[in-house]
Regions:
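Conserved NAD+-utilizing ADP-ribose enzyme module
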Residues: 14-25, 29-186
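Extended catalytic/binding region for NAD+/ADP-ribose chemistry, centered on the ART fold
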Residues: 1-15
Length: 186
């Protein structure tokens, strides 16, 4: 979920099937839900959360280091109602894969996650949170495939180009990488 209507429309038609999509809008009616905000916890906690739930090729290296990384930087998200963090679609999981292979310095991780302006996503996690959702009047609304799929693809292309530039550029020192963070005192 996103609070950015334009991004939600792009995500509604990001599939390559030439079909129009739908965007829905909800509001949360329970102000007492627990929200785990990874922007407050930091990029390393977010990376650990992604590693818990996404496949980075399941290489031997990933299997060896990810559990240590999760133990060191992860947080217990099991008791929260809503998770707030950087958008983590499949194209951006490339960042995690490169991080696992020590190709990305931690100093550029947050900048990489912000490329493409994908913003923040919300994960409604608990039954209590789902029960607290109410539909906003006037939704769902149709989303034109041609317009918003083109926007999605252009945003993705620009972000991938910028990722490649940043990863291969001078800002990426590749010194404070996953293996050094796991083994060191970072």
């Amino acid at each position: 979920m996103s609070d950015d209507l334009s991004l939600a429309k792009e995500w509604a038609v990001c599939r390559p099937n030439d079909q129009n999509g739908w965007v829905h809008a909800f509001k949360v009616t329970d102000p007492n839900l627990s929200v785990l905000d990874f922007q407050e916890l930091g990029v390393l906690a977010w990376m650990a959360e992604l590693m818990k739930h996404r496949d980075a090729g399941k290489s031997r290296r990933f299997n060896m280091l990810s559990q240590k990384f999760i133990a060191k930087f992860g947080v217990d998200s099991s008791g929260c109602d809503i998770i707030r963090g950087w958008r983590a679609n499949a194209s951006y999981f490339y960042i995690v894969t490169e991080f696992v292979h020590d190709e990305i310095d931690v100093d550029i991780l947050e900048e990489l996650l912000m490329l493409g302006g994908l913003g923040i996503q919300y994960c409604i996690k608990s039954p209590r949170a789902f029960a607290a959702l109410s539909k906003v009047s006037g939704y769902p609304r149709p989303v034109a495939y041609g317009e918003y799929n083109n926007r999605y693809n252009e945003r993705d292309r620009q972000a991938r180009d910028r990722m490649d530039e940043l990863i291969s550029g001078p800002a990426n020192k590749a010194v404070r990488v996953m293996s050094t963070l796991v083994e060191g005192d970072a």
